[in-house]
């Protein structure tokens, strides 16, 4: 189809260039394989023998694997290069699809073997993406030109298989402890989804015999599937206002490790937009860059050593945390002795942003002013980077 389309478009006057590119290749990767990883090595160790210090050898600290081989990645590319309207609009569209097998991964071993891991060829992954590049002259006159350029990239990857282990359904098994989930991207967090902070309105509040407040979660779970909430969500412990509220993702009425979900770290797409103006020797260049859908775990919100955990360390208490007089729905109440529950889930934040990466203003001196000098061309400019960033 594409061949016939290109054939019929060859005489269209406004098309300067239209080129189809197709490629396929297989490449190898040996990163992680040392010079002697496939061999059984011995470590030189010293020991006391009587009154004499002797040198000897012990089995190496890493189990060798004589069957190691390169990773293999097979990639197919389909691209179109084009130029229209006497070069005023040009660009490239490209789609790629990659399948990788025999990934170099540290396999977990039973400690009774004397080793806990071994480098091995495991698993399969697949990835695909689209790259778009577009450049055009919006205005082109003798004294003034204005050009725009944009780049767009969207990429995703997925774990197909980790090893030969199967789950109870006979399908390739995930390894949750390592963050490797079948059908999910390679780079993910595995955590709870946060629905805010518990407020007073979430509880029925009473007093016990000694006058202390007793907080009982209101019924929000429909155990009979009849459309009527008849029981509270079971958090496995006491819940009070100011604590983190997480989602019962599997709908069983209980908050357990099974409610954790993979949360993609990598952005859904990236985009850039550049603009260049030229007028009577002056030029102005502006470059914007945006990232959408990226997730990060902010250590300053959960890690005690980095200032988080809301226990008064460094800047941890400077966030908008919950108190009875400031019922924030963003951060839990602080604690003097222990981290609030589910704090790591609170720390996962949307890292999408738009940034003015570069702003440059320049002036090129006319040739007539340089006529009697050894200088053939002179341009002065000032550049600023990362001037503005817009993010949540």
Question: PLM features: what roles do these ranges have?
Answer:
Residues 4-18, 31, 85-88, 139-146, ...:
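Short loop/turn motifs that connect adjacent beta-strands in outer-membrane beta-barrel proteins
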Residues 11-13, 26-41, 103-107, 111, ...:
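Outer-membrane beta-barrel and related beta-rich outer-membrane complex signature
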């Amino acid at each position: 189809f594409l061949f016939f389309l290109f054939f019929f478009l060859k005489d269209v006057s406004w098309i300067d260039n239209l080129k189809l590119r197709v490629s396929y290749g297989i490449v190898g990767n040996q990163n992680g394989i040392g010079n002697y990883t496939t061999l059984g090595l011995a470590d030189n160790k010293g020991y006391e023998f009587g009154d004499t210090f002797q040198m000897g050898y012990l089995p190496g600290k890493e189990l060798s694997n004589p069957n190691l081989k390169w990773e293999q990645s097979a990639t197919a590319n389909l691209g179109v290069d084009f130029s229209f309207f006497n070069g005023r609009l040009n660009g490239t569209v490209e789609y790629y699809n990659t399948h990788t097998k025999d990934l170099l991964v540290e396999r977990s071993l039973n400690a009774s073997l004397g080793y806990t891991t071994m480098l091995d060829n495991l698993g399969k992954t697949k990835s695909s993406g689209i790259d778009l590049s577009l450049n055009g002259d919006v205005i082109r006159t003798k004294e003034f030109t204005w050009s725009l350029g944009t780049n767009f990239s969207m990429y995703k990857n997925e774990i197909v298989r980790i090893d030969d282990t199967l789950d109870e359904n006979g399908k390739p098994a995930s390894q949750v402890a390592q963050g490797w989930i079948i059908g999910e991207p390679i780079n993910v967090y595995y955590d709870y989804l946060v629905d805010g902070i518990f407020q007073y309105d979430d509880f029925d509040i009473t007093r016990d015999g000694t006058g202390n407040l007793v907080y009982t979660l209101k019924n929000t779970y429909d155990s009979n599937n009849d459309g009527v909430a008849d029981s509270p969500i079971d958090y496995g412990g006491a819940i009070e206002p100011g604590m983190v509220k997480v989602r019962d993702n599997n709908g069983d009425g209980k908050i357990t490790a099974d409610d954790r979900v993979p949360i993609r770290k990598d952005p859904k797409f990236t985009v850039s937009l550049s603009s260049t103006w030229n007028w009577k020797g002056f030029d102005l260049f502006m470059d914007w860059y945006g990232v959408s859908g990226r997730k990060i775990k902010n250590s300053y919100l959960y890690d005690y050593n980095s200032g988080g955990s809301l226990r008064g360390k460094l800047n941890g208490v400077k966030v908008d945390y919950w108190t009875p007089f400031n019922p924030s729905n963003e951060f839990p109440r602080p604690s003097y002795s222990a981290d609030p529950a589910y704090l790591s889930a609170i720390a996962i934040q949307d890292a999408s942003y738009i940034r003015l990466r570069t702003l440059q203003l320049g002036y090129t001196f006319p040739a007539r002013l340089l006529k009697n000098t050894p200088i053939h061309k002179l341009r002065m400019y000032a550049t600023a980077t990362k001037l503005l960033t817009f993010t949540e």
